[in-house]
Amino acid sequence: MSPLLTARAASKSYRTVSLVGRSPAKTVLSEATVTLSEGETVALLGRSGSGKSTLARLLLGLEKPDHGTIAFRGRPLGGFSRAEWRAFRGAVQMVFQDSLGAVNPRHRVGRIIGEPLRHLTTLDDAGRAARRDALLRQVGLTPEDADKLPQQMSGGQLQRVCIARALAPGPRLLVLDEAVSNLDLMLQIQMIDLLKDLQRQTGMAYLFVTHDLRLVERFCQRVIVLDEGKIVEEAPVTGAQRFEHPASRALQRAILPARPAAASVGDDEGGRRSATR
């Protein structure tokens, strides 16, 4: 697998400003080195405040590292032209934890999915409509759902809409920032199985940002563990995961002993697909 997106010794600090002045800089990410390759699924695992979301924002180009570099297919983001940034925005997309907060509640589903098609592709009106309908079907919804408002959909359905929106420009990498954490166990399983199906169809890579080792074991091939802003461990995902670092083992002890499993899972309310294991 060829490298797709890399971080090399990336560090990030923040200061807070109050009425009494600026606070000392707090380092939230320290010399993180990560390589994401075509077609693989990598977990970024850590407790709250470990630096996971900061590293994800740097990889997405939403923030700049204080030190180190982020590169897409070997080209540092800091040297991108406007055209290269536009191509990068289409190639690397994100799905957020809060699906309702990630969409405009006044926009219908068709418009939500249509925004990246309008800004990141060269399709005409007819082409965008056809692509929108195909995306809805691809995530287990129907073209009729394009006329619905977000509040008319279940949580699982709306997360499918967010995935369809992220797929719209044909990305090579999806960053999933706690993207299934707000769903119940059965919906988590359905969403993971949907993402696996989409990966088989498209060959895209995933960066799965999470604190839940059970989902990592079900979904990912490789896991990177962060603690206090540092990468403390990196390992392939195995059926019986054995960690070395104390922070990794603490995460392992925190999960329930049973792994999620289902023989046959029905879809979320109003959904059209079922996941069968």
Curated annotation (Swiss-Prot):
Pfam families the UniProt entry points to: ABC_tran
UniProt subunit comment: The complex is composed of two ATP-binding proteins (NikD and NikE), two transmembrane proteins (NikB and NikC) and a solute-binding protein (NikA).
Membrane topology per record: Peripheral membrane protein
Catalysis performed (reactions): Ni(2+)(out) + ATP + H2O = Ni(2+)(in) + ADP + phosphate + H(+)
UniProt main location, coarse: membrane
Cross-referenced SMART domains: AAA
Keyword Ion transport on entry: yes
Recorded family membership: Belongs to the ABC transporter superfamily. Nickel importer (TC 3.A.1.5.3) family.
Stretches assigned to the ABC transporter domain: 14-253
Protein name, entry field: Nickel import ATP-binding protein NikE
Gene: nikE
Protein purpose: Part of the ABC transporter complex NikABCDE involved in nickel import. Responsible for energy coupling to the transport system.
